[in-house]
Amino acid sequence: MQTTAVVLEAPERLTLRPLALRAVEPGDVVVEVDYSGISTGTERLLYTGTMPAFPGMGYPLVPGYESVGRVVAAGSGAQDRIGDTVFVPGANCYTDARGLFGGAARRVILPSAKAMTVAPALGPQAALLALAATAYHAIAGGKPAELIVGHGVLGRLLARISVALGGAPAVWETNPVRVAGATGYAVTDATADDRRDYASIYDVSGAADMLDPLIARLAKGGEVVLAGFYDRLSFGFPPAFMREATIRVAAEFKPADVAAVTALIADDRLSLDGLVTHVRPAAAANDAYVTAFGDADCLKMVLDWSDVT
């Protein structure tokens, strides 16, 4: 079996080409992808070649962990999934490319247990479930968010989920293009905020130089949550010591986090409206990646695979 996939042959060298797929196992499903999102965090690092080394890292690779599509075939133990609309959090199914994280392809193979059923009506918004689950995972692991740093799509999801759970976070954003779009919370600049008693600060800016200024805004016993993706980080110890600060790293989401945000959406407590700002055909993947990483007006870029065989 073959598929057509986005392939990063090397940093900043992207192609759309056929790839061979591994054999289908009894517990697998074959998903025909309708939409896949482009991550401006991990995928940007893979695209630019600045991703810190980790086991399994290397090129060529198929990126993507934000795909949605329909189960069109399955192994003998998963026949009941055929016809389901599912969210695909990545796939490692290619014989001649690495799956990091493998979701940006027209057809993918993955274990049935990892393909999460979603409402077909979500359409391209279903590609946001990975980010929504990432935001929920960060919040569920600690104190409610009092301050969120960054009003990109992940920051907006953090804020919306916080409001849905009864919170009232403040949000900082330095780019005037991204200040608009708040519902149920206020967006401001750090220079207009003189608070220095935040119990919890969630950073989704990904900026490596944010720890010192954020620690300075904490109350005693406060927490800074690193919900972005960073290279090397450092901070001055005395201010953190004086505040007895906690620095927590929020890692990848779990299936329970996807289930939680899916329930919030189903109960009309969480809206994904206004977050997918750009949809491009998969055949225009090169231009789509450039726009996703370079255009501040692009909150979320989604590839449409409907015209790819």
Predicted regions and their residues:
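C-terminal hydrophobic helical "lid"/dimerization subdomain
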Residues: 1, 164, 212, 255-309
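NAD(P)H dinucleotide-binding glycine-rich loop of Rossmann-like/cofactor-binding domains
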Residues: 86-149
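A short acidic, Gly/Pro-enriched loop at the edge of an enzyme's catalytic core
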Residues: 193-201
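Hydrophobic Val/Ile/Leu positions in short beta-strands of Rossmann-like dinucleotide-binding domains
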Residues: 147-148, 203, 226
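Glycine-rich beta-strand-centered segment in the early N-terminal region that forms part
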Residues: 22-38, 50-92, 121
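Mid-domain Rossmann-like dinucleotide-binding core that forms the NAD(H)/NADP(H) cofactor-binding site
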Residues: 122-194
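Short, well-ordered coil/turn residues at beta-beta hairpins
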Residues: 35, 89, 202-204, 305
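Glycine-rich phosphate-binding loop and adjacent beta-alpha segment
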Residues: 208-269, 305-309
